[in-house]
Amino acid sequence: MVDFLFDEEFVPKSRARTMRRNKQRASGQVRGEDKPFIGWDGEGWTEHVCETPEACENSNGSCKHHYYLFGASTGHYVSGRSLSTAECFEVMLDVKRDHPDALHVAFSFKYDIDMIFKDLPTGAMRYIMKNNRMHWKGFYIEVLPGKWLQVTKDKLTCRIYDLFSFFACSFVKALEKWNVGTASEIAHIKSGKDQRGSFTLDNLETDVVPYWRDELRLLVQLADSLRDILYSAGIRPARWHGPGAVADYLFREYKTKLSMPAYESIPVGVLDAGQYSYAGGRFEAFRIGLYDGPVYSADINSAYPYAMSGLPNLATGTWIHHNGMPEQTTISDVTLGMFHIRYEYAEGPSRDIAYGGMPAASHYRYPKSGTMHFRNRNPGVWIHAPEFRNLLRQLQLGMFSKFDVIEAWVYIDDGTKPFAWILDIYRQRQEWKAAGNPAELAAKLGINSLYGKLAQRIGGKQGVPTWHQLQWAGHITSTCRAMLYDTSWRHFPDLIAYETDGIYSTRPMDELPNGVGTALGQWEVEEYSGVLYLQSGVYWLRDMDGNWKKPKTRGVPQQHMEFDKAMEALVSKKSLKVTQNQFIRFGLADMRRNGNNIWRTWQTNEKEFSFGGDGFGSAGKRLHVAKACKECVQGYGYEETLHTLMLSPKGFPFVDGVHAESAAHYLPWRKLGSQPENSKTAQVLTRWGES
């Protein structure tokens, strides 16, 4: 069986450069820069049976969507009323046979994968979603949506990589950002994409095929530009499935494995603490509504790479276990440590800060839902050293009525920093950026791709992915959360929101760790003239010229979020309702009663954005309750000022008559407690690229 995720050959940088300079190649092999890219894409049409195609909601899936064009930039393609799975596989193998040394790429290929798999029965689809590979009618299929589709038959294999995650934007925006294609060519592609909803059998050859050919031609140019820029920065990924391939190259190039202990050699207690203490980035809205006044943002420059650059070597030090609080010198000197604590804030001003505003810098993960809250008290949680130090500063101020350190794992390192090279890449990127050298994009892509590999949960041959290291990953995110909290907890009345590595507030933050500047880990500050903040992650900023910028959204394209409609919703105190077309992929379809009918169809769905969230019963960290909102009590409308959100009143679950401690981060190969229900769903959808 073919190795699935980590079977690439590693070519050291020195050897790669020598081969390129001397035009040498390994026996029988073609150099990476000499391998041509072949672009792949497909198009579909909807067979409407409804009376109003222009307003088709298709809730029952009666208007079927068909794949009627699939092929490559070489000119090979297959077309027909509704292509079969075998037809699509065969054209892939035909192109591979004719172009054995080419690299095959697509852009945002998830839609195409579902359409290509139309003939696979439900049981087969469930199997391949779980296992990512299977035999079917003489073909051997490997698929990881968002990364690649691979088909093998008669010892001939074609793998199509999905380039989308390299760019994380629409194809048109990628062309514009990377200076690929002329203005008229890009306009033609945009026009074609806008007309996809009106594709029919009748205009396949006259309109669709010419547009499709132009798109593939530009896709090849985009792939060439990506490779040229990566190579110019000394980055030569062995695969082309996204930033993870870049991270894989960098980890191998800088011999990261030498700084990682064997997974089975890590003490069980450290592995347990790592799962309990890990938490992701902190998204949290504190105030929502319209604010007509100065708004300040402060963002950490490359926050995760910064935290990563200071990590210790885990292969040359020792984990030490402490019962109770370690000595102060140990806490001050340690880089990496995890602390098991419980706490509750005291009465008075301290309680006002914690209960009425900013909760402590530690998370609580609910066992059933897997959601994380930042609470004013905690029956038990493991946290990393950066956030623990924040709490110790508050402890010294006498802010707690209860603060217990139950145990700790502290890492004593030898002072070596295996990721110090990140700082060199960041500095080089700054120089390239100042000089207008596009290689800066490769440097940015490289260092920003690293953290994800350390936190990866899916993809390992034997369960544990190659670069998984949760103690490192947990320290990285904790460093970022601690920096946000350290600079802002005293200024809760001014805060609008946390956004992972940034803060929005109505006054400038005057205590920014590392200061303001362009260096790694310093802060970039900006000022705006207003904000409309609807709910966590959904907001509009107004620049200093009085123009509203494009919205920040979650799960809905920007063009569907209209500022005027959001304002109308505020004034009327109603939810903002957004309509969008959604392609129903298998993972989502299989969770619905009429899944077989709606799979591979387009539906019109309405998404609702309520003011501040969903009120009582919401799973959110904070919520808007009019009776508890001082601005509402004072008679201010949503469009008149910012309204303060209250901490969720959600209590802690009980286990054997006592409050349960914060639950562990779920790992498929190492279970502590039960898997949260939302994690089960997310795991299935992630495997099919739908998260």
Where are these regions (language model features)?
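Short beta-strand
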Residues: S297, D494-E499
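Acidic, Mg2+-coordinating catalytic module of metal-dependent nucleases/exonucleases
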Residues: F171-K257, L484
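Conserved DEDDh/DEDDy metal-dependent 3′-5′ exonuclease domain
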Residues: H76-Q195, D214
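Short hydrophobic beta-strand that contains or immediately precedes a catalytic carboxylate
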Residues: G39-D41, I160-Y161, V295-A298, Y304
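N-terminal accessory regions of nucleic-acid-interacting proteins
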Residues: M1-G42
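C-terminal, non-catalytic extensions of nucleic-acid polymerases
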Residues: L222, R227-R287, L314, W319, ...
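Gly/Thr-rich phosphate-binding beta-strand-loop-beta motif of the actin/hexokinase/Hsp70
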Residues: R25-S73, S302
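Short active-site loop/helix that positions an aromatic residue
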Residues: I113-T122, F171, N301-T316, R507-L512
